[in-house]
Curated annotation (Swiss-Prot):
One of its GO terms (cellular component) is photosystem II. It is a multi-pass membrane protein. Residues 1-2 form a propeptide. HAMAP family: PSII_PsbC_CP43. Binds multiple chlorophylls and provides some of the ligands for the Ca-4Mn-5O cluster of the oxygen-evolving complex. It may also provide a ligand for a Cl- that is required for oxygen evolution. PSII binds additional chlorophylls, carotenoids and specific lipids. One of its GO terms (biological process) is photosynthetic electron transport in photosystem II. It is found in: Plastid, Chloroplast thylakoid membrane. The modification N-acetylthreonine is found at residue 3. It comes from Tetradesmus obliquus (Green alga). This is Photosystem II CP43 reaction center protein. The gene is psbC. Keywords: Acetylation, Chlorophyll, Chloroplast, Chromophore, Manganese, Membrane, Metal-binding, Phosphoprotein, Photosynthesis, Photosystem II, Plastid, Thylakoid, Transmembrane, Transmembrane helix. PSII is composed of 1 copy each of membrane proteins PsbA, PsbB, PsbC, PsbD, PsbE, PsbF, PsbH, PsbI, PsbJ, PsbK, PsbL, PsbM, PsbT, PsbX, PsbY, PsbZ, Psb30/Ycf12, at least 3 peripheral proteins of the oxygen-evolving complex and a large number of cofactors. It forms dimeric complexes. Belongs to the PsbB/PsbC family. PsbC subfamily.
Length: 461
């Protein structure tokens, strides 16, 4: 009986016998068909851009200006808002038209890419080497492969520079640290000091150091993109105009599956970094759009109760909690004045609504008694009830309100999805790296299944 999974099924003129791969192996059937593989890639790009455009318009259609973005489950509009589109002081949305334009532009682009994908999949030449040698390639051609790497690096560099140009010359970007609670700001003095920019890379990823995730000002972010954009473009030119050195020729496996494994490893790393960035960072991911970080929600709660009880007559400087430590304020391990209670674990949190109340030795008692502004109280109360925690009542000392039961923070969505996808991509990296290395070493592909128990079992029919 013929089934979808046996070798006799032919799809698109290609069967398992002629290609070595079944229909469900997807693009593996196109390994040596550069024209058809181009079609698959362009169509894939079209799907990605279509999702971006359609989801963008979906979020615009459902957007309620009176509610914060993070309360509406949005993940695309916060990115556009962070780029300075449609927002004003305090992150307030003042114009949704730029978001609509973004969605339409992506939809139009996806149509062009979709047409190109269909054309190259069905009509265009199966291979490019004969008709279009510049675009053709052989997987083992080391020089051609590094040329292609170079083109990719240049495009990535241009992408990084687009953010720089937007921030410096085309309207600026949203800066959560702008005085008074955040605003769109032109970055006139980006950090170009290599010691500062690359100092982030040399930091420990643990504890309060936080590697590149610890970046806490827009000047460093834009300056970092200047460096990354320039290095990517220069690296791209290098790889285009040079051939791989002997040590590189020997060190790497030069096959299609090897390149796939390298790409999966790189994307996996990016996924893990994006996970940490979206979860911990409130500069690149402003809390006005993505909601508070976990530590931020916890500190907000401590601040809110301090404000409330201070108004009711409590002496917040000396009141003791049930453990004998300070109920509202206490000392950090290094002597700074910090919030007391369970939020002590987040004592090194930094946020634009709290920093004005600090002095040279942590929180300033005089400022806490006399200088708290209404916008700080409002923001802390809002953040306190929108913690990015998967709990109906209490986690880590953060109490949520009944109205927050159905709230899931965009930080939770973004961090979880990027971690899970990053992990799967890492497994894919290991899988394809192992296959590529085995093939390069001349091993038998696949696993010997002669001893599988299923082979000795009675057929189902």
């Amino acid at each position: 009986m013929e089934t979808l999974f046996n070798g006799t099924l032919t799809v698109g003129g290609r069967d398992q016998e002629s290609t070595g791969f079944a229909w469900w192996a997807g693009n593996a059937r196109l390994i040596n068909l550069s024209g058809k593989l181009l079609g698959a890639h362009v169509a894939h790009a079209g799907l990605i851009v279509y999702w971006a455009g359609a989801m963008n318009l979906f979020e615009v259609a459902h957007f309620v200006p009176e509610k914060p973005m993070y309360e509406q489950g949005l993940i695309l509009l916060p990115h556009l808002a962070t780029l300075g589109y449609g927002v004003g002081p305090g992150g307030e949305v003042i114009d949704t038209f730029p978001y609509f334009v973004s969605g339409v532009l992506h939809l139009i682009s996806s149509a062009v890419l979709g047409f190109g994908g269909v054309y190259h999949s069905l009509i265009g030449p199966e291979t490019l080497e004969e008709s279009f040698p510049f675009f053709g390639y052989v997987w083992k051609d080391k020089n051609k492969m590094t040329n292609i790497l170079g083109y990719h690096l240049i495009m990535l560099g241009i992408g990084a520079w687009l953010l720089v140009w937007k921030a410096m010359y085309f309207g600026g970007v949203y800066d959560t640290w702008a005085p008074g609670g955040g605003d769109v700001r032109i970055i006139t003095n980006p950090t170009t000091n290599a010691a500062v920019v690359f100092g982030y890379l040399l930091k420990s990823p643990f504890g309060g150091d936080g590697w590149i995730v610890s970046v806490d000002n827009m000047e460093d972010i834009i300056g970092g993109h200047i460096w990354i954009g320039t290095l990517c473009i220069l690296g791209g030119l290098w790889h285009i105009y040079t051939t791989p050195w002997p040590w590189a020729r020997r060190a790497f496996v030069w096959s299609g599956e090897a390149y796939l494994s390298y790409s999966l490893g790189a994307i996996s790393l990016m996924g893990f970094i994006a996970c940490c960035m979206s979860w911990f960072n409130n500069t690149a991911y402003p809390s006005e759009f993505y909601g508070p970080t976990g530590p931020e929600a916890s500190q907000s709660q401590a601040f809110t109760f301090l404000v409330r009880d201070q108004r009711l007559g409590a002496n917040v400087a000396s009141a003791q909690g049930p453990t004998g430590l300070g109920k509202y304020l206490m000392r950090s391990p290094t002597g700074e004045i910090i919030f007391g209670g369970e939020t002590m674990r987040f004592w090194d949190f930094r946020g634009p609504w709290l920093e004005p109340l600090r002095g040279p030795n942590g929180l300033d008692l005089n400022k806490l008694k006399n200088d708290i502004q209404p916008w700080q109280e409002r923001r802390a109360a809002e953040y306190m009830t929108h913690a990015p925690l998967g709990s109906l009542n209490s986690v880590g000392g953060v109490a949520t309100e009944i109205n927050a039961v159905n709230f899931v923070s965009p930080r939770s969505w973004l961090a979880t999805s990027h971690f899970v996808l990053g992990f799967f991509f890492f497994v894919g990296h290991l899988w394809h790296a192992g296959r590529a290395r085995a093939a390069a070493a001349g091993f038998e592909k696949g696993i010997d299944r002669l001893d599988e128990p299923v082979l000795s079992m009675r057929p189902l029919d």
